[in-house]
A protein has these predicted regions:
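Secretory targeting signatures
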Residues: 1-28
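Extracellular calcium-associated, cysteine-rich motifs in secreted modular proteins
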Residues: 24-130
Length: 130
């Protein structure tokens, strides 16, 4: 009878342990766990898991300190770990990436709104009807 109580106690403990482990939510607290990297602690547009993949800091929206959020850099083909990206001009429109970010324009398209005027001379570079 004592052996049965021990077995039952061990099974209950095992059940409680397994239940606790399966209750962990995907809150982004473990960026190395592919099923638990969905949070974006620093609000830069990259999930914690993506931060891990890009080698950026999940607690710093601008890991390289260039004034451009990591997510914006990644989404525009720039490097979130290269502080020199802010001064680049990949589309050749005369605006730096930092200026493109501030204006809300596309650093890879000289005419973001498609109105025939390059962003650097367009008074409303995001309004195709200007």
């Amino acid at each position: 009878m004592k052996m049965n109580k021990k077995i039952v106690s061990m099974l209950v403990a095992l059940f409680l342990t397994i239940s606790a482990l399966s209750a962990v939510s995907g809150d982004g607290s473990d960026p190395l766990d592919p099923s638990d990297g969905g949070a974006d602690w620093d609000g830069d547009g990259l999930t914690n898991a993506e931060e891990q993949n890009h080698g950026t800091n999940m607690n710093n929206a601008d890991s390289d300190g260039d004034g451009l959020p990591d997510g914006w850099e990644v989404n525009n083909g720039l490097s979130p770990t290269n502080g020199g990206d802010a001064n680049g001009d990949p589309d050749g429109d005369g605006l730096t990436n930092a200026q493109e970010y501030a204006a809300g324009t596309n650093p890879n398209n000289a005419d973001t709104d498609g109105d025939g005027k390059n962003d650097n001379v367009d008074q409303y570079p995001t309004d195709p009807n200007d």
